[in-house]
């Protein structure tokens, strides 16, 4: 182990040395560029573009381009990137992750690789976690890019397709991750090329990259249509779930957050729903609803996982503590929670297009990201995204003091200690940021502070509209801010007058999050740019994390230390280590789970690539699509004829072939049984293909304008493909829900999913061939056809 660590440290040192040397080359141009007039500096942009067109690479241009935009930033923004920021910029240009501590100027760092890569003219996307940050950065940094002669676009949800297209055509586009994903999916659902808004995905710099590529990795982006509502079934199953008792009827696995019926529970269900066998294939819809009702009633917690506002169930993001507007749990879980809470059940939806962030961002030719906390997830970034995490040194040393964790026996004794600490610090005027994991904790703490007459503001999922303003003032003397997790991320907490002298910003964590990275983010709000600061986490044996993973070992440790009583407290590095090892286990579980999602989504990705690729070929075609249609007809003819001409000729089913000819190929007067008799199977196939050629020629004659013929072909293909593809996505979703049960039969669910998914995909292709054949051959031609 020591050898491995030594190699890692050496490798990191070598990387930083190389980056520092390259940053020196950028610095070498500083004096020359400072002498240039504004016009001469601006003229560098077209000069670099021309040199790129003439064969120089972006790597060749890096030292001069970085120096030019650095000088531009000094003149336009009054900010001059430090040496370490240039190093961070190089990391981003190379398609890796720059881990830069809070307050080290990530936004300014990104200007250098953004400018350099925009010179290629293929588009650069700067991706942020919310629209507030997108708009802020597009406005502030856009001033610099515009001055240097580049165009900047801002993409947001409320923009029209025309405005979106314009934003994507710009050299640099600011957008949230969700909007890029939905635009990608919508682009692959349009029926006219002109309706597409995106260019091919070229280079993205993802701000708060850990939040987007790790915390949200499992969140699929889904475009859906209405499905048949089944609210009566949700209510009925919910009523049943509420009759069950834990241990007797069902068991909860806290680690994996799953609920399973016991034999007694299964018997109760069969009696309640009057069934012989609950797990019969005829009952899959019922068992699916039951799984969701069990999760809704016994796993999903109100005010932690979701809140109920104005008769609506709203999801709370477990990482940021924010309400996720417009998001609904899929697969009927949301409806099950609505039934549990007795609010109106909204219709279930059918998935029409979907993709995970993992697969969306892996489609970029080059991807990079920046964040204050990524090192703990370095392995995941390397394995899934092929990106290295480079910890960029701070401009000034970090002088913040991180105290060892304090551990209390109960929640009550812990919160008494937290309130006392807040009171003490408030008396000397030191500003505090108090981090909580759940909305209910922030409200409970707020109530306790009201009782003590301590003025404070609460930032949680219920009021995040003003979060940037609140967080900006959190560093003023006497400010007390309670925030769920990473509310206000991306906004700096600057210290007010006189705060440095009393110790800077104090960060108090009321619980450890299951991810070390989220704890590190909270710590990182204090001690920016060499400011003083202090962080302290308060834990209790009744905390979620301790209950799930840490408590047995810690309890025995407390017993050995003879610690008892309500007010007992332990401050020990050993406790901190225990907690971190519990967190590593959770992180390991979460990583495995994300990897698992990716393996399943990769099956869909391959299918999606095939379908979207074919679809785009059809949409972009400007001549004839005969080369697509005729092979589809041939595959259909070959399959149908082969199926009905097996064995001896006397056993062939010519009547069914005649029916096929009439229903899918031509009118009854064009074919008879005599046409099929006394022919070999190959001759029958050839006969059908002759008919197809005749019909094609006839339609061409009717539509004498080639453009109209092409439009007719596109209508046929797009209608058939889209209808079958959306059904297929939905079927794959259902397959995925049910596949886990096969794990109990000693089968590997992933392998089963891959095999069944492939078989279903092949069946869909056959169905598309058949329906396209029938629609093309049998359609009446109209002049005004629309897709």
UniProtKB/Swiss-Prot annotation:
Alphabetically ordered keywords of this record: ATP-binding, Cell membrane, Cytoplasm, Membrane, Nucleotide-binding, Protein transport, Translocase, Translocation, Transport
Top-level class of the enzyme under EC nomenclature: translocase
Enzyme Commission number(s) from the entry: 7.4.2.8
UniProt GO cellular component terms: cell envelope Sec protein transport complex; cytosol; plasma membrane
Membrane topology annotation: Peripheral membrane protein
SMART domains referenced in this protein's UniProt entry, alphabetically: SecA_DEAD, SecA_PP_bind
GO biological process: intracellular protein transmembrane transport; protein import; protein targeting; protein transport by the Sec complex
Entry-linked Gene3D superfamilies: Helical scaffold and wing domains of SecA, P-loop containing nucleotide triphosphate hydrolases, SecA, preprotein cross-linking domain
Catalysed reactions listed for this entry: ATP + H2O + cellular proteinSide 1 = ADP + phosphate + cellular proteinSide 2
Transport as UniProt keyword: yes
Molecular functions per Gene Ontology: ATP binding; protein-exporting ATPase activity
Cellular localization per UniProt: Cell membrane; Cytoplasm
Positions annotated to bind ATP: 85, 103-107, 492
Function comment: Part of the Sec protein translocase complex. Interacts with the SecYEG preprotein conducting channel. Has a central role in coupling the hydrolysis of ATP to the transfer of proteins into and across the cell membrane, serving as an ATP-driven molecular motor driving the stepwise translocation of polypeptide chains across the membrane.
Family affiliation: Belongs to the SecA family.
Assembly, per entry: Monomer and homodimer. Part of the essential Sec protein translocation apparatus which comprises SecA, SecYEG and auxiliary proteins SecDF. Other proteins may also be involved.
Classification via PANTHER family: CHLOROPLAST PROTEIN-TRANSPORTING ATPASE, SECA INNER MEMBRANE COMPONENT OF SEC PROTEIN SECRETION SYSTEM
Protein name: Protein translocase subunit SecA
Organism placement in taxonomy: Bacteria, Bacillati, Bacillota, Bacilli, Lactobacillales
